Design a protein with these regions (language model features):
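Solvent-exposed, non-transmembrane regions of membrane-associated and secreted proteins
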Residues: 1-208
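Juxtamembrane interface at the cytosolic side of transmembrane helices
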Residues: 213-223
Length: 223
């Protein structure tokens, strides 16, 4: 049930993103990069919720980890509401657009009865790949380390100068949840062409557009 809803919302996100003018998407990506640069220089976080917020789905990006069958939406913040419907982005960390001097930290539940989310995160090994799809781009990260920390130590996971890092966080031990498992990955640039996220046929696009159009009409009528 959860995965079916997740597939639908991700499909809607991709559809809206694909039908957004390239200039707007490029501007959104550049704004996120500027945000990350400012975060590295002075730790200021301004207009966080408005950046990477291109669609009505509220999704900022998606994450795919083929080796553990993860394909999930990423949302702003780490509230209970966010973590019950997908993967959360720690506001104090870099946005998921990559670049030098960036460290994006994402978190997800483990062992939820209704959803797997990051349940299998402990199965990741060095060199396993993680894909972030954002603003019509695909960023590739490779696992370099995994370790366990206290919950409060997550706040100390800062940016490493010159590095482009991604860390995934979930609760551990399984079912006890007193500590945090961290899987750390580093950006790579594969020579082989990266498999892009799913593309849709005309028939699929028309079918997926129905709820999007309905939402737009509803908002207009509500005004």
């Amino acid at each position: 049930m959860f995965q079916s809803r997740m597939e639908n919302v991700i499909s809607s996100f991709y559809l809206e993103e694909d039908t957004t003018q390239n200039k707007l998407v490029e501007d959104a990506y550049l704004n996120a990069e500027l945000y990350n640069q400012q975060l590295f220089l002075d730790q200021k976080r301004e207009k966080y919720d408005t950046i990477l917020n291109l669609t009505s789905t509220q999704i900022m990006a998606t994450i795919q980890i083929p080796v553990i069958d993860v394909d999930l939406a990423i949302y702003h913040g780490t509230s209970d509401e966010v973590l019950n419907r997908g993967i959360g982005h720690f506001e104090f960390s870099s946005l998921p657009v990559g670049g030098k001097n960036s460290h994006c930290i994402l978190t997800g539940h483990r062992g939820m009865p209704s959803a797997k989310l990051f349940t299998r995160l402990d199965e990741l090994k060095k060199k396993d790949r993680i894909y972030i799809h954002v603003c019509k781009k695909t960023l590739v990260y490779e696992v370099v380390d995994s370790f366990v920390v206290e919950p409060e130590d997550i706040l100390d996971m800062g940016i490493e100068e010159g590095q482009d890092l991604l860390s995934l966080v979930t609760c551990t031990p399984y079912g006890i949840n007193t500590k945090r498992l961290v899987v750390k990955a580093k950006r790579i640039f594969p020579k082989k062409k990266v498999q892009p996220r799913k593309s849709y046929s005309i028939r699929e696009l028309l079918f997926l557009m129905i709820p999007v159009v309905f939402l737009i009409v509803f908002k207009v009528v509500k005004r």
